[in-house]
Amino acid sequence: MNELDPIIYTIRPGDTLYNLAMQYGTTVDELINTNLALNPYNLRVGQQIYIYPRYNMPSQDYWISVNQVDLANRMNLAWLEHIMWTRMFLISVAGDLKDLEATKNRLLQNPKTIADVFRKYYGNDIANLIQRLITEHLVIGGDLIVALKNNNEKLANELFTKWYRNADEMAEAFSKINLFYSKEEVRRMLYEHLRLTSEEVENRLKGRYEADIRSYEKIQNEILMMSEFFVNGIVKQFPNLF
């Protein structure tokens, strides 16, 4: 049961459900369940939602250090590049474009970009593990796109299984390096990322281009929520650095 009466919160630029959940001591799932008409991937500035805080409402004006802003910028850019180059690869496969190999090579540079954001805080061994797992995620996803394009259902099913197993491994790895990275929460976000990406791939390959674009917009919002989750975990684990 909620401890306090609900407040009415007005969505501001930059708000995400994860950020609001952290700010008010609740969860993303509870925010969604409390606001059934809410689209979690398309928060509108000025939109009003109900929030049941689990502690006294904090000030909406809170201070963020320069170091935290820098971390957030680097984390956001790394994950946005992740989905952007994945989309470029999808478009190249779907359209049999000549830039496929060059696009794939650029896509596979992204795991190091993401790993380097974590390297500063966790060292080379953990950063290299993150890089390996994200590389596997991209390679499996790339092979899956090709299998779906070629209507190879048997191979696609095998790759789907490997893709989700890789997500489980990532959730396990992240949960071990930071107590603020709940394995269940990381797994939930990664599974949602795979679901939305699968939706994007299906729409693109079937020529549903408007739906394809909407899928990508959902992925953008979801990946920024995930990026913010990782940033907040680092800030809480290493408060002296921020």
Residue spans for each PLM region:
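A glycine-rich, hydrophobic loop/mini-helix early in the fold
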Residues: 106-124, 132-134
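Primarily a LysM-type cell-wall glycan-binding module
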Residues: 1-25, 47, 55-56
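Mid-length scaffold segments of soluble, non-membrane domains
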Residues: 124-158, 163
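Short acidic beta-strand-loop surface patches of small beta-rich interaction domains
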Residues: 32-39
